[in-house]
Amino acid sequence: MSFIFNRETFEDNSFNEVLREKLMRALNLHDRTVGSSSGAMTTGTGAVECSGAAAAGQRPPRSKGGFSKVDILKSGIIVKKVEFPTIPKLEILDLDVSIQSKSLIKGICKVSCRDAMVQITTEIESNLLLLHVNSSPKFTTPKLISNDSFTVPITMTFDKLHLEAITNIFVKNTGVGISFNDVNLDFRLQCSIKLLQSSIEKRLKASMEEVFKDVLPSVIFNMSQRWFTHGETVVPTVDKSMVSSDTPVQPRMILDESDLSDLSPANMLRLSTLVSSRQTLCLNPTAVDTISTIPGCLERQNLHRFNLRFPSLYNYYSNKEQQGAHNNEKNRVEHLKLWGRSSSNPIPTRASFKVENTLPKEVLDSNSYDVRVITAIQTKMYERASNDVVLRRRKIKMRSRKPSKANKDAVSPAQNDSGTSSCSNVASELPHASLQANPQSDEIDPAPEGGPNAEDAYKEELEDSGLRAPQDFPALENVTPVLAQLPNQQRSRLGSPLSAGRPTPLLSPLDDSHWLLQKRDPQDLRTTLYSPIRNGRFYVMPQPQLDTKEASAFLLENGKRFGFVGLLNNHNLKWGNDPPPPYREVSITQ
């Protein structure tokens, strides 16, 4: 069983006009101005325009479940054109007619429609911020300086519309109910705003399931009610919550005044602080001494302030020095410079916040740092760092060094002791040369730095002062030369470490060389031009007479022993509690 559609009905333009009017009324069902036959008027061109507040751009937000939705439509939807170039096909697959007091018809049909075209136009709101502000509570939205409405007209054309679906039809004495199953819909969209064309097409195809499930069945049922009421106008029932008054729509109050007393004052203060902080577009806060505008909250633009206040070696000692200053104005200027502020530059710059973790130069010069404080700061910085960093300790490995050529030629301490005893025996048999000390000077004259003339002049100066050149003594046998292969190097004047004000006697050249040998490493030891150690041989200085009063006379005991530094003391060559020479004074006794 099937129905045959009358071709003349679809070819007549009056059918398209009626269908366009009904489609427009269905699309504007939720608008307060479109709900009756007088809510729309037809122009001379055949287009239907919305009257009232819909044309003026006022549209209440739709509500579902008590929550308002953001609606970008600023006016009603106008259906400008509807065409059916191909006659639709309707095939009845099953039909059940019940003969009862209430007539009821059930059937299953297959609907096929091709090459249909629908063109609609409307106005949308392009300022989405305005829509969100109007539909949000006041305490969560900032106060915007400029937030005006900006409407944009848009026209959409649906052509090459192809529809195939299986429908279940229920016909009662009050209307017709249709449900769609297995819907296959395809169309092409042309939008006046090309930037939104692809996005709108995807959203419409995704929402077609809801259209055939809810929208079309309600439209067909409302239209059928007029037929079953013998042409009487039936106003569709609209929920009272969807109809608004003439006053502007106010956002819904979540909390009443009675509910505010139950809230925590601390939480409300934090919320108000959060709202006030969002009322500016400034990236840098205006306060100088605060890290952020919200206490306990670190913002990204204020991260440099937190880094400056983080304990480091530089800012710890800098703040410590600033606390002890007396000039408050100078401290304020230095504080502003540390933060990158000045009278001409109130907003800090990024380059001025780089602070290195080093001690200030003034602290190092004054030696006023504490090792325990430095350790605590460095430990705290390591603990706050990432856990991926492995702590490394500095290790010092002590290894025995291989003796070099210079060390092989040097005399060991044991050989020095044996050489000392052998030299002391030989010294008792040799004639002595007098050595006179200069009590007015506690420094050793350096060797001349000039040529041969300078050397002769230096020798004459020594002879005038009472120091005679060493005589030709027989060479000491069985004595290992000390540093014979090292080049000669002149030695600067050496100051006496004794207390100032008292003259100290000069050490003998042999004692002086032995003292240098003990103080410095063998590889760093250099002999002077007039050193007793010369050409690998010892020159023995003669012992002065006992009746002389020079301090140098008591360096050698009665001419029997050499007075090497480290061996001469007041305990018969036994080491005692006296400080080691040359850091002691030689007592002069008769």
UniProtKB/Swiss-Prot annotation:
Annotated localization: Mitochondrion outer membrane
Origin species: Eremothecium gossypii (strain ATCC 10895 / CBS 109.51 / FGSC 9923 / NRRL Y-1056) (Yeast)
Protein name, per record: Mitochondrial distribution and morphology protein 34
Molecular-function GO terms, alphabetical: lipid binding
GO CC annotations, alphabetized: ERMES complex
Gene: MDM34
Annotated region (Disordered), positions in chain: 393-456
Domain of life of the organism encoding this protein: Eukaryota
Subunit structure: Component of the ER-mitochondria encounter structure (ERMES) or MDM complex, composed of MMM1, MDM10, MDM12 and MDM34.
HAMAP family: Mdm34 (MF_03105)
Compositional bias per record (Basic residues), positions renumbered to this chain: 393-405
Protein family: Belongs to the MDM34 family.
Biological process annotations from GO: mitochondrial genome maintenance; mitochondrion organization; mitochondrion-endoplasmic reticulum membrane tethering; phospholipid transport
Function: Component of the ERMES/MDM complex, which serves as a molecular tether to connect the endoplasmic reticulum (ER) and mitochondria. Components of this complex are involved in the control of mitochondrial shape and protein biogenesis, and function in nonvesicular lipid trafficking between the ER and mitochondria. MDM34 is required for the interaction of the ER-resident membrane protein MMM1 and the outer mitochondrial membrane-resident beta-barrel protein MDM10.
Listed Polar residues bias regions: 413-427
Residue ranges of every copy of the SMP-LTD domain listed in the record: 1-225
InterPro entries in the record: Mdm34, SMP_LBD
Coiled coil: none
Major subcellular site: mitochondrion
Record's keyword terms, sorted: Lipid transport, Lipid-binding, Membrane, Mitochondrion, Mitochondrion outer membrane, Transmembrane, Transmembrane beta strand, Transport
Written domain comment of the UniProt record: Lacks alpha-helical transmembrane segments, suggesting that it resides in the membrane via beta-sheet conformations similar to those predicted for other outer membrane proteins and porin. The SMP-LTD domain is a barrel-like domain that can bind various types of glycerophospholipids in its interior and mediate their transfer between two adjacent bilayers.
Bilayer topology annotation: Multi-pass membrane protein
